[in-house]
Design a protein with these regions (language model features):
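Glycine-rich flexible loops
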Residues: 1-133
Length: 133
């Protein structure tokens, strides 16, 4: 998880504060999350936040850190998933800028099958309906 965030930063895909990662441990009611407020280029295993899923959701961290503010999205994706074990949620700076500029990213990546096949950008990003309180 930490290496994924560090590599995304190293490649220039994110700034130090963009994105989060979660992993659900197989056959366990446990999800590990990257913490809130920690620079992604220095995050380490000791900083990860553990979310125990039971009748109540409980968080714990060796360094007393809070989970990502988007923990609920990670939980909703992973709680009943049978094949998905991880969520990588990043906000690439260049993609965000291009979307705000009105570029049609879906059409732009078609000539690049390695991007088109495996990456979702713009309006073709699968989305979860808004959460209601």
């Amino acid at each position: 998880m930490c290496d994924v965030m560090k590599e995304a930063y190293r490649r220039g895909w994110i700034t130090t504060r963009d994105g989060n990662v979660s992993v659900r441990k197989s056959n366990a009611n446990r999800i590990y999350l990257t913490p809130a407020g920690v620079r992604k280029n220095v995050v380490n295993v000791e900083m990860l936040v553990r979310m125990d899923i039971g009748e109540e959701i409980k968080f714990s961290s060796k360094m007393n850190l809070d989970p990502t503010g988007e923990w609920d999205m990670h939980y909703r994706i992973l709680k009943d998933a049978t094949t998905t074990k991880s969520v990588v949620h990043i906000h690439p700076t260049n993609i965000i800028a291009a979307m705000h500029a009105g570029w049609d990213l879906h059409d732009m990546v078609k000539p690049f099958p390695e991007v088109f096949r495996y990456t979702r950008v713009g309006h073709n990003v699968p989305s979860i309906p808004p959460l209601r309180s």
